[in-house]
UniProtKB/Swiss-Prot annotation:
Record GO cellular component, one term: cytosol
Cleaved signal peptide residues: none
InterPro entries the UniProt entry points to: DUF520, UPF0234-like_C, UPF0234_N, YajQ-like_sf
CDD domains: YajQ_like (cd11740)
Protein name: Nucleotide-binding protein BMA0373
Organism taxonomic ancestry: Bacteria, Pseudomonadati, Pseudomonadota, Betaproteobacteria, Burkholderiales
Pfam families in UniProt: DUF520
Record keywords, A-Z: Nucleotide-binding
Known function: Nucleotide-binding protein.
PANTHER family noted in UniProt: UPF0234 PROTEIN YAJQ
Alphabetized GO MF terms: nucleotide binding
Family to which this protein belongs: Belongs to the YajQ family.
HAMAP family the record matches: YajQ (MF_00632)
Superkingdom, natural source: Bacteria
């Protein structure tokens, strides 16, 4: 019986590349000359450092631009509070979301069941498994979910025939 998994996970290799490119651009830009602006990554957590709120916004814009170029959906980013650190410097912690939350999983299952497509959806941890008799039904389910769920980036993987 063909099936696939609905997951929500950022490509961490591309995130790392985007962070490195952002740091490279920040180090060469004229408006950041002499400032301590940078982006650091620890696992699924990014920390943005800058001299003031305005420069922090610019660092954020550079990071978002680099992520968009590397096809990393910026809806994965969850921005924390802006914190003041020593003097005028500020930092902001950005976490990268992973997994389909319980509410989103229930929403996906409800959309699949209400669609009257002959497939079954079941929640399995931080993913939703969709299985059906025909491959065409699964492909129409993928199209339906891409159209209906716009607030969270969804990936479809583990396609089994």
């Amino acid at each position: 019986m063909p099936s696939f998994d609905v997951v929500s996970e950022a490509n961490m290799i591309e995130v790392k590349n985007a962070v490195e490119q952002s740091n490279k651009e920040i180090s060469t830009r004229f408006d950041f000359k002499g400032s301590d602006a940078r982006v650091e990554q620890k696992e699924r957590e990014l920390t943005l450092y800058a001299d003031d709120d305005f420069k922090l916004g610019q660092v954020k814009d550079v990071l978002i631009g680099k992520m968009a170029k590397r096809n990393v959906d910026v809806r994965f980013l969850d921005y924390g509070k802006i914190e003041k650190i020593g003097g005028d410097k500020v930092k902001q912690v950005v976490t990268i979301k992973k997994g389909v939350s319980g509410d989103l999983a229930k929403k996906v299952v409800r959309i699949v069941k209400d669609s009257k497509i002959k497939v079954q959806a079941s929640i399995q941890g931080d993913a939703v498994r969709v299985s059906g008799a025909k491959r065409d039904d699964l492909q129409s389910t993928i199209a339906l979910l891409r159209k209906e769920v716009t607030d969270t980036p969804l990936d479809f993987n583990n396609f089994r025939d």
